[in-house]
Amino acid sequence: MERNHWNEKSSGAKRSRERDLTLSTIRSILAADERLRIKASSYLGVGRGVDDEAVIDIFPTGQTMSFLRLLHGFLGTCRGQSMHQVLRDPCVLRKQLLYGVCKTLFDTITVRRVAEEWKLHAALFPYRALDEEDLEQYLLVWSASLRQSVQTGVLGALRDILYQYADNDDYGLYVDWCVTVGLVPLLDVKTKPSEAAERAQFVRAAVQRATETHPLAQDLLQANLALLLQVAERLGAVRVANAPEVRVFKKVRSERLEAQLRGKHIRLYVAAEPLAYERDKLLFTTPVAHLHEEILRYDGLCRHQKICQLLNTFPVKVVTASRHELNCKKLVEMMEQHDRGSDAKKSIMKFLLNVSDSKSRIGIEDSVESFLQDLTPSLVDQNRLLPARGPGGPGVVGPGGAVVGGPAGHVGLLPPPPGPAAPERDIRDLFKKQVIKCLEEQIQSQVDEIQDLRTLNQTWENRVRELRDLLTRYASRREDSMSLGARDAELYHLPVLEAVRKARDAAPFRPLAVEDNRLVANSFFSQFVPGTESLERFLTQLWENEYFRTFRLRRLVTHQGAEEAIVYSNYTVERVTLPYLCHILALGTLDPVPEAYLQLSFGEIVAAAYDDSKFCRYVELICSREKARRRQMSREAAGGVPERGTASSGGPGTLERSAPRRLITADEERRGPERVGRFRNGGPDDPRRAGGPYGFH
């Protein structure tokens, strides 16, 4: 039975409502926490600029940085390394842009515009003669002047634009990235409205300045002003990254190559993708990566040669090594000598202990006998020393010196003693001599032991000094590991005395006495400098083979076979220049420059582009049409003259033939202006004479 409260609601209903409210609150808190966590993680992810996916660093690393250093001569430079300077020549890009823009400009001309230019010229300078040779010369002069005017105006405008916006090292940096890492980080530059207006003003001013006296060239450039502005804008809108904050990496999971500059993603052009066949490591397929190991080997040999040249200048050098086996042998000898039983110090100590323990005369005699017997058993005559304790046992000395007693009744005769005190003096003298001898031997043994310990101490002291030098050297190498390459490179540029000092500090030599515990390992009695010529020739051949086979550069030689120059080929333009033009500058509509034109000057390239364009064809068409029209007019003017084979008024049977017309060969038509200096009737024909074909009066 439920208990009702004063507000007429049961306690169970109240608890249910509170439980629902609590659960709703908990759900709201969890949902808010989830949203906050998602937002925080996304915010932190954006702030870092990199997600949690594992990456493999490509640049900068020790390997890729060494690629760039050795590419520009900081490591292992040789003669063949100049091949790279041919490839990164910025004039190639400028000539490519010049040819492509000129070809596009000249192809945009119309035949109507060329015809109008001809009509204007014909109206100002009409042709009144009917001679075909004079007409041809007239047309050649007009076409040559038109050609020169257009080429001069176009060349002046494009030269100013290219040297203003293409006079940087972006193309060289692009080539450096291609041959080292194979990846080119690109930075898109945002153009401000003021910069765009300034660029447009510069282009218009360049066109106006170059075509003030060339109206047709001015009309042509004004009609293609959008193309000129596009070229100038694209040249300034893209930069090859050249900063220490550049980072290039590859994501492991998505296998994407990315680049960053100061934490922001930038565009990346892939020229040669690294191989990812090894875990957490990439293999580069660029030319410099192929030459890297050989270049480092050659550079190490050059540094070794320089150090040998600086250090090996003393008359004699000796390299010594420790003879540890001799030290061990000495230790063993000392131990054996220490363990000998005939040690003088032990004998004296033993004798003193025995004497102190003796309580009677017999004990003292036994101690003396034992002491003397241990030291010099072969020198002591026991019978003379102790007659009563001879080897035959105790006996009685009879009259005449006979000894009665001993084994088997042995009777011996002894020489008569010199006096009653002779045995006692012999024992005292012998004992005194033996004690002095023991003391001398003890002193000598201590001196020898001190000398041996001193020698051993010197040996270990030298060994400790060597170990300390090694530790100091290793510690200095570890501290200078980052600046080791720069320090070694300084040896090539420092003065000789300073370089010698640095080399001696890096590899010090000190005089060392060759003691008993050292042996000579090697010696130098003259200066030794290793040669690098063979390895340099080999490395030069590697550079040339790698670049010639990769980019197919072309070698120009003289008639004697000597090398004259190394230039781009058509394949090189397609392999290196066109990708930069299409993928980076976005100017793929421009025609590629032929390899024969890359050796020409700017003026010759403009002339070659004119010859390959529709402009030249339209001018030839106008000239051919005018020649045909003049021939038609000549035939119409000669209509009253009888044709060939008809009788004239001169009488029957007489034929008046028209003068044979001289035919112009194709070679003479191609030479054109070379026929100006011709002769007629024995004298030069001046086209500017009065009543001439050009209408000058």
Swiss-Prot record:
Keyword Signal applies: no
Keywords (A to Z) from UniProt: Host nucleus, Viral genome packaging, Viral release from host cell, Virion
GO biological process, alphabetically ordered: chromosome organization
Main location: virion
Compartment annotation: Virion; Host nucleus
Keyword Metal-binding: no
Superkingdom of the source species: Viruses
Region (Disordered), start-end ranges: 633-697
InterPro entries to which the protein is assigned, alphabetical: Herpes_Portal
Any one annotated GO CC term: virion component
Pfam family, one: Herpes_UL6
Composition bias type Basic and acidic residues, residue spans: 664-689
Function recorded in the entry: Forms a portal in the viral capsid through which viral DNA is translocated during DNA packaging. Assembles as a dodecamer at a single fivefold axe of the T=16 icosahedric capsid. Binds to the molecular motor that translocates the viral DNA, termed terminase.
Subunit relationships: Homododecamerizes. Interacts with terminase subunits TRM1 and TRM3.
Family per similarity comment: Belongs to the herpesviridae portal protein family.
Protein name: Portal protein
